[in-house]
Amino acid sequence: MEQLPNGYSDYYVPDGFERNREQEFERAENFLHVYSSKETEESYTVRCSIIQPGQQSLFDNEHTTYENVKVGDADATLGTSASENGDTVYILSWEQGGVSNTIMGNISRDEIMKIAENVF
């Protein structure tokens, strides 16, 4: 695969969040979308890229707790850690159809999972 499938994107945005187009990028082979809420000061990113041969995921084991979860039918890894100011930060990673997907943010676990289920 040389580029993301046509129309591949994230299709669910929680209430109160706006996309920050200045901090993001979109290319044929990958994208990064950045969202934030002015009200709650929460934010998250959605990063999707085609899987490159030999690509490895690096995980921070020292400060993050990992568990196996499902995103649809795909096996996923959900990491939980704390930011410098004590907020809970989640990082969810999974692969589907030759695409590596990562969502990271200080939003609720339920919202992270709902966003993930609407990436296609």
Predicted features along the sequence, with ranges:
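Short, solvent-exposed recognition patches
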Residues: 1-96
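Surface-exposed amphipathic alpha-helical segments
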Residues: 97-120
